[in-house]
Amino acid sequence: MKLKIFMLAFFTGFVFVFSAAAIFVYRYSATDKKAPAEAESSSPEIYAESETLLLIFEEDGAAGPFTLVCFDPQNGRIPVLTFPAAAVFESLPDMPAAAKVYKELSHSEFAAATEKELGIAVSGWFIWNRNTCETVMAKAGSFDYILPESLFYSDGERYIDLSAGVQSITGKKFYDLVTYPDFDEISRCDVTSRLISSFFGRRVRRFLPEGSALSSSVYSSTENSVDAFSRAELRGAVKALCAEKTPISSHVTCDLDEGKDGELYFSAVTRERIKKYFTAEKNE
């Protein structure tokens, strides 16, 4: 009798312990399976969409060049492309040059025309000038840039003397390079794009702190279309971009085809580059 009672108690206890262990394993296995999803949902910046800005150089009534900067978290890069005021917008009636389109439209309408012409989405536009160069660089600090050749200019009003080799770029030097009088439009676009690419490659992390002095200097020294909501989205893209490793900032060459009367058209190669670097697709 005692043996039967002992066996019954032992069997009952075994079933209880086994059931408890099974429930424990099931519950914690389910938790483990859900962990990645929960981790993903708690880090929305990983999935931040790319943000493309249109930077418009404007001073003394003249505009251009025009620069596209894309903050692309999915591919970990910041491509920069600059096109001249003479570039033709083939998607518009009479195919006007960018300078004419800009003159006849509002800033936001020009951004929309750029979207249509190049097949991209522009998140916001910024108007920058000499004051922007000096104000932003005063907060960002100078950065090194390799100048391939010496540049000299003097006309009684302006004096520019930059030696070939490594230059420490200040606000004045930034402005002098972008507006160097003896550059043709293609050379000006190339230098502008490389300067802006170098700037973001070296200084993008300084935009990360909430209300950073660098961000404030950009917004205060420019006319722009970026409201509080857009600023939050832009900051989210930059935060995601810098989350794991230093993003690659690169100059994207803007090749132009010359028409019979000297018009400059975006080449097929350039349009392919824009499609590759300024759209939201992830490159495997």
Which sequence ranges carry the predicted segments?
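Extracytoplasmic/secreted envelope proteins and their assembly/folding machinery
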Residues: 65, 107-115, 119, 130-134, ...
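Solvent-exposed, acidic/flexible segments
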Residues: 46-49, 60-62, 103-108, 126-130, ...
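Flexible, polar/acidic helix-loop-strand segments at domain edges
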Residues: 138-214
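Entry/capping segment at the start of metal-dependent catalytic domains
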Residues: 2-81, 269, 278
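Sec/Tat-exported extracytoplasmic proteins
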Residues: 57, 114-122, 129, 140-144, ...
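Amphipathic, coiled-coil-like alpha-helical scaffolding segments used for oligomerization/assembly
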Residues: 104-161
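Flexible, solvent-exposed short loops/turns enriched in glycine
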Residues: 79-105, 149-164
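C-terminal solvent-exposed extensions
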Residues: 54-62, 75, 79, 84-96, ...
